[in-house]
Regions:
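NAD(P)-dependent Rossmann-like dehydrogenase/reductase catalytic/cofactor-binding core
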Residues: 216-265
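Residue-level signal for short, function-critical loop segments
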Residues: 70, 173, 236
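Predominant activation on well-ordered alpha-helical scaffold segments within soluble catalytic domains
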Residues: 76-83, 137-141, 183, 243-250
Length: 265
C-alpha cells in the first residue's frame, strides 16, 4: 500500500515507523512521519514551514517529511527566530514549561481521564518527564541550533486539548535588543496564515485551551524590560500534530498552507 500511494501518513511508534519507511521502494512516494524517529535524521525535512523560506522549500521538494512534536513545536517557534536574528546566543541556557491537554497522551491516557474510575490525582495538573529525557528534547536542541538542551517541564492537565508553551528569559540574556525587538522579530516572521502574533490573554489570564479545536498557533510576548515571557498557544492535536501534517501535505500538493485547516481569526 505504501508503494502505491502518492502520499502516506505514518502514525506509528518509532520502531514501526522506521520499518515502514524501509519498505518503501517507490521513489515518488511522499512519507509524512508523525513519530519521533526521523525528526533529526539526515535527508528528512522538518515540517515547520514558518521557520524560514528554506524550511518551506525543503518540505515542498522532499519525499521524506518529519512532522514536529507537539511540545517541540512551541519551543522551536519561540526560540528559533531569536537565534536566527542574533538576539539570543546559541549558548543561551533556557528553560521551557509546556502545559497540554490529556489527548496528547493518546488512547490510554484519554481513557484514564474520561473513565468512570478516574482517580483524584487526575483532577490536578501532573508534571512528567522529570528525568529530563523527554523524547522531544533532541529536536528542540537540533532545530534551534542551541548548544545545550533546555530544562524542560511538560505538564498534563484535566482538559482535552490545547497547549501553552512558555520560555522565560531575562533581558540580560539577550545579545542585543529588548522586549520590543523580540516582538518585531516575531511580527516579521509570523504574519499568517497559520502562525500569527498577538495577545490571547483575557482579563490577565492566558488559557492553554484558547486555540483548542483549531490548527493555528499564536505567538505572545509578555513581561517587562527585565523579565520576558515568550508563549506559544495552539492545539496539541492541531499545529502540534495533525494540523501540521496536513499543512505539509498542502505544500507538497502546491496548495496554500492553510487549505482545509481551521484557523481562528
Amino acid at each position: 500500500a505504501l508503494n502505491s500511494a502518492d502520499i502516506s501518513f505514518l502514525c506509528l511508534p518509532d520502531a514501526a515507523a522506521i520499518e515502514a519507511v524501509e519498505l518503501v521502494e517507490n521513489e515518488k512516494t511522499v512519507i509524512l512521519d508523525t513519530s519521533t524517529a526521523h525528526r533529526t535524521a539526515p535527508g528528512w525535512a522538518y515540517g515547520f514551514p514558518e521557520l524560514s523560506a528554506e524550511f518551506e522549500a525543503k518540505i515542498i521538494s522532499s519525499k521524506r517529511i518529519a512532522v514536529p512534536g507537539c511540545h517541540a513545536s512551541g519551543f522551536i517557534a519561540l526560540v528559533y527566530p531569536l537565534i536566527e536574528a542574533g538576539l539570543l546566543g546559541k549558548d543561551a541556557l533556557l528553560s521551557c514549561t509546556s502545559l497540554t491537554g490529556y489527548s496528547g497522551g493518546g488512547k490510554k491516557m484519554i481513557a484514564e481521564y474520561e473513565g468512570y474510575e478516574k482517580g483524584a490525582p487526575l483532577f490536578a495538573p501532573r508534571q512528567y518527564g522529570t528525568s529530563q529525557q523527554h523524547k522531544h528534547l533532541k529536536e528542540m536542541k537540533a532545530v534551534c541550533g542551541i548548544d545545550e538542551f533546555p530544562i524542560f517541564c511538560p505538564i498534563v492537565d484535566d482538559y482535552y486539548s490545547g497547549m501553552e508553551v512558555t520560555v522565560p528569559i531575562f533581558a540580560r540574556q539577550l545579545k542585543s535588543g529588548g522586549i520590543e525587538d523580540i516582538k518585531a522579530v516575531y511580527a516579521e516572521k509570523y504574519n499568517g496564515p497559520v502562525v500569527t502574533c498577538g495577545d490571547e490573554s483575557q482579563g490577565g489570564f492566558l488559557s492553554a485551551s484558547a486555540l483548542s479545536g483549531t490548527d493555528g498557533m499564536k505567538i505572545c510576548v509578555y513581561g517587562n524590560e527585565e523579565r520576558i515571557l515568550l508563549t506559544a498557544i495552539y492545539d496539541n492535536l492541531g499545529k502540534g500534530a495533525s494540523g501540521a501534517a496536513l499543512e505539509c501535505m498542502n505544500l507538497v500538493l502546491g496548495k496554500e498552507k492553510n487549505y482545509g485547516l481551521s484557523i481562528k481569526r
